[in-house]
């Protein structure tokens, strides 16, 4: 069984990437997130020559789709009960799935299944 991401990781990610202001004034070019001087993984993910592999970059939106409902799981307890199984399913396909399974996960519009509550952004 694969454990879900710890709550401290989500808190740190939100605090580090979105809540901290830039450390110095810089011109913000929307095409280059590094010019905003935000120490965030987004700039690395959007660069073609990033240190992350293509597979990790492709699965990052899928993992974020999981983290978004997981972050609100305390107020949505019935959804929280399904979350560990979904995380384990996504992780098993990411690590051990065949190419066809990975392709289907990335192409299907609702993979993994979306929550019943209408929240599109964190």
Swiss-Prot record:
Keywords: Glycoprotein, Secreted, Signal. It is found in: Secreted. Residues 1-28 form the signal peptide. One of its GO terms (cellular component) is extracellular region. This is Uncharacterized protein ZNF22-AS1. Glycans are attached at residue 49. Its main location: secreted. It comes from Homo sapiens (Human). The keyword Secreted applies.
């Amino acid at each position: 069984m694969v454990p879900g991401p710890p709550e401290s990781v989500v808190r740190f990610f939100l605090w580090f990437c979105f809540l901290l202001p830039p450390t110095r004034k810089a011109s913000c070019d929307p095409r280059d997130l590094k010019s905003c001087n935000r120490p965030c993984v987004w700039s690395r993910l959007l660069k073609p020559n990033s240190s992350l592999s293509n597979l990790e970059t492709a699965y990052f939106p899928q993992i974020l789709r999981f983290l978004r409902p997981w972050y609100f799981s305390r107020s949505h307890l019935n959804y929280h009960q399904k979350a560990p199984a979904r995380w384990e399913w996504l992780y098993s396909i990411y690590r051990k799935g065949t190419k066809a399974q990975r392709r289907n996960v990335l192409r299907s519009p609702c993979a993994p299944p979306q929550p019943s509550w209408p929240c599109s952004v964190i």
